[in-house]
UniProtKB/Swiss-Prot annotation:
GO terms for molecular function: deoxyhypusine synthase activity; enzyme activator activity; enzyme binding; protein homodimerization activity. PANTHER family: DEOXYHYPUSINE SYNTHASE. NAD(+) binds at residues 72-76, 98-100, 104, 213, 282-283, 316-317. Belongs to the deoxyhypusine synthase family. Pathway: Protein modification; eIF5A hypusination. SUPFAM superfamilies: DHS-like NAD/FAD-binding domain. Heterotetramer formed by a homodimer of the non-catalytic regulatory subunit DHSp and a homodimer of the catalytic subunit DHSc where DHSc appears to bind spermidine and DHSp appears to bind NAD(+). This is Deoxyhypusine synthase regulatory subunit.
Amino acid sequence: MSGVPFPSRVIGDLDYSNLLNIGQEEAIRCVLNAYPNIGLEATNLGRARRIVQRALNDNGMDGNKVMLAYTSNLISSGLRDTFACLARENRIGAVVTTAGGVEEDVIKCLGDTLVGDFALNDHALRNNGLNRVGNLLVPNDNYRNFEDFFVPLLRRLHEQQRDSRWTTKTTPSQIIAEIGAALESVRPNDCGSSLIYWCYRNDIPVFSPAFTDGSMGDMIYFYNYSRKGLVVDPVPDVRRLRQLGCKSTNVGRITCIVLGAGLPKHHLLRNVQADAVVYVTTGSDADGCESSCNVMADRANGLLSPNCDVVRVHGDATIISPLLLLRSSDGKEKVGVREDGN
């Protein structure tokens, strides 16, 4: 804009009268296309959409990679199928999550997760065998089913280690891949909705640096209490993630989609040299921690390179993520084509 000494453009109004006179699908497309010029957080969402759409379309082409980081509550929510679709269509090249981000995906193959209310009485939930994830409810039976599924897998891995006289060191990502294979064998009718299954099928590594921080950690502990010698070694996973994200060995563009903050965000960005990063977070600068600090702090702390293209969208990922990933075309175009055609 003339006379303004920094990048800017005229605000674009959303023509609400027009939205009332067109079909729902076209109206959604118009709103998505309008986001970059609306201002405030809508502009950040519009900018983030353009990065995400282009990256998903280009994943695997010319060495380009998309890496997804998410917190466990998101896989507990209805976003699970969205993530599974990205893996099924090979739109992502690696995943970083918490232990719960693995467990809750598998648990949904074994039982239903319910939607309740944020204000439900916690004592009553506990007395009725229900666990809370915000307003989501997970019955105790689901975790018992998960134990029945997971312990035999540990037994097989332990036997492999013992037979190799412990020259075989099992990493968290290898265990997660074994979980995907077990789902295909044990739950063939349910595994099609699982992110972990599709990552296994398409050889997409899933990294979980805090693998023992959850139900799987409990089971590994109790298994080793009665049967000594099961070893889980996370160090090779760090090396593998760094190799995937090292610019000196990759000619393509690396884009990181970070949904939520905490461990997944920090572990991914500290080990990957990203060209573009999209954050979706409700974290506040006042937290004073690297997992939810702002873009300037992340640059200062070395998580982002000076030339990294970064957009931080402040909001609930269950609301923002579908808008980032939703195609605004009529379905004839490939995923990721930008609205402006560029």
